[in-house]
């Protein structure tokens, strides 16, 4: 089965007098985080139950700093499913291992809005310049709100995992349908 490691990347900010201290997004305290973890667990179970291929969803790991993220990125999984809530860029970069598959999930309407819904493209993927700069990721690896979109990506990655490194016999030579 395809081993999927879900990760909730977040940061809780402390109140600071006479300044703007709240982060952008909908996760502001431990209660919000607990509710989000529960929401993610339910959504992942529903998605896994609907999958028609072998999938092993590992327990959700919360990460709040780059050191934790780097350790998780090296873990024993095929796909890292990153819930990019409101963590720093350094955390997301540490979670992304170019040698493994990564899918970023962000919320706009399906729960508390995530900061990275607003800035994933310009800050994470493009690094505030015109060219893409995040190794191992592009805009097609970012999913907004839709677990059906995650599931078809996981289905494709499962097929790829089960094909890579295998011998394939093509009778009459390799080919497909159509002209040419």
Predicted regions and their residues:
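An N-terminal assembly and electron-transfer interface module characteristic of large anaerobic redox
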Residues: 1-180
């Amino acid at each position: 089965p395809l081993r999927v490691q879900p990760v909730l990347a977040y940061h809780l900010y402390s109140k600071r007098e006479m300044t703007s201290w709240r982060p952008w997004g909908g996760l502001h305290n431990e209660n919000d985080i607990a509710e989000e973890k529960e929401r993610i667990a339910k959504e992942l179970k529903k998605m896994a139950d609907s999958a028609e291929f072998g999938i092993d969803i590992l327990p959700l790991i919360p990460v709040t700093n780059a050191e934790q993220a780097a350790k998780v990125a090296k873990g024993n999984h095929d796909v890292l499913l990153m819930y990019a809530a409101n963590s720093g860029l350094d955390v997301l970069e540490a979670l992304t291992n170019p040698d493994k598959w990564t899918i970023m999930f962000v919320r706009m309407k399906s729960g508390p809005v995530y900061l990275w819904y607003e800035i994933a493209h310009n800050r994470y993927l493009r690094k505030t310049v015109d060219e893409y700069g995040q190794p191992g990721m592009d805009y097609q690896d970012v999913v907004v709100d839709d677990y059906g979109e995650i599931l078809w990506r996981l289905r494709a990655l499962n097929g790829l995992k089960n094909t890579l490194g295998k011998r394939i016999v093509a009778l009459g030579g390799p080919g497909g349908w159509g002209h040419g």
